[in-house]
Regions:
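A C-terminal functional module that forms or caps the active site or interfaces directly
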Residues: 3-108, 112
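Short, flexible loop segments at boundaries between secondary-structure elements
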Residues: 111-120
């Protein structure tokens, strides 16, 4: 059985290295802020924006927004010269699961869980 093209290849991936961080808003923003360096971007949700101290692209406030904005956000990372990206993990249920599936492929399956100690 052959895999469908959507399952075989890394789609819609920017040039930057993407790592998905499975974390709540506080853990995500604290970790990303602690990693500040040239070329670092956050791919975040609207609730994270007030706390980030690095360049970011918000996917929006809910799963529908995230699905709508993901591909444009990935292209924008290239346009803005991102070299490394930490992306907050979307919900793995409902529409969020579709967003997660596209994002995990763009991240070449790089995902880490933050446990409150800011270690990825």
């Amino acid at each position: 059985r052959a895999d469908s093209p959507g399952m075989k290849y890394k789609h819609y991936a920017p040039k930057a290295k993407i790592t998905i961080l499975d974390a709540d808003s506080r853990e995500f923003t604290e970790y990303v802020n602690s990693q500040k360096k040239e070329g670092l971007f956050a791919l975040c949700f609207e609730e994270d924006v007030p706390f980030l101290q690095v360049p970011y692209i918000s996917l929006g406030k809910d799963e529908t927004d995230q699905a709508k904005h993901l591909f444009a956000a990935l292209r924008e990372l290239d346009e803005r010269g991102a070299q490394e990206v930490y992306a907050r993990c979307p919900s793995k249920q409902g529409v969020g699961l579709a967003v997660y599936n596209r994002l995990i492929r763009a991240a070449a399956y790089q995902e880490h869980t933050l446990d409150g100690e800011s270690e990825a």
